[in-house]
Amino acid sequence: MIFDYFQNHSLELIAVLLAILYLSLAVRQNILCWPAGIISSVLYFFIMNSAGLYMEAYLQIFYVLMGFYGWSQWKKVTNDSFVVNTWSGLKHFYAISFVLILSFSSGLFMHSFTDAALPFIDAFVTWGAIIATYMVAKKLIENWIYWFVIDSISILLFISRGLIPTAFLFGIYIVIIFFGYKSWKKILEKNNEIVS
């Protein structure tokens, strides 16, 4: 029975392992996070599409593109000069407004014209993830807070679609998020001390 489960979900399990590797390396500011994330995203494109989570499926294409962007951005910086940045409250207002407006409009579109499962929730986590991924590439500390909200909602979304290994992955993400935030906060504080 367990063997059958692994056989039927092998692609998802490989994607999960690569995604864990991605986030673990990102917490350590290791540039190898990006190729692991790219490969995981390619696999997840097919997984999400077959689960009827079309926004999540196409989000994976964005992740691949952002993976290459993040990889190129991080190549410009050595580990000794890894700089963590922060956004103003106004930028967060714009980002959150952007997510909410696009979530509603694309959720409405998906609800009206496709057989998408949970289109509004799918749209919200997709647009939120787009902003959060951009924030990771720009090394903004608040990315971890955005990911906490997105991943918490995603767990429920994936459970509802029977993607249990992926829901488990996002549970692991929730734990790693705390370590990532703490690690990046130390770097931000160190950067601020150097500037002062």
Predicted segments with their positions:
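Polytopic alpha-helical membrane-helix bundles and their juxtamembrane interface segments
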Residues: 1-28, 77-78, 86-145, 149-196
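Hydrophobic alpha-helical membrane segments of integral membrane proteins
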Residues: 35-39, 55-58, 145-149, 167-169
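Membrane-interface helix-loop junction between the first two transmembrane segments
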Residues: 25-39
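Solvent-exposed, amphipathic alpha-helical segments
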Residues: 41, 45, 155-158
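Membrane-water interface of transmembrane alpha-helices
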Residues: 61-77
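Mid-membrane cores of alpha-helical transmembrane segments in multi-pass membrane proteins
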Residues: 38-43, 63-67, 98-102
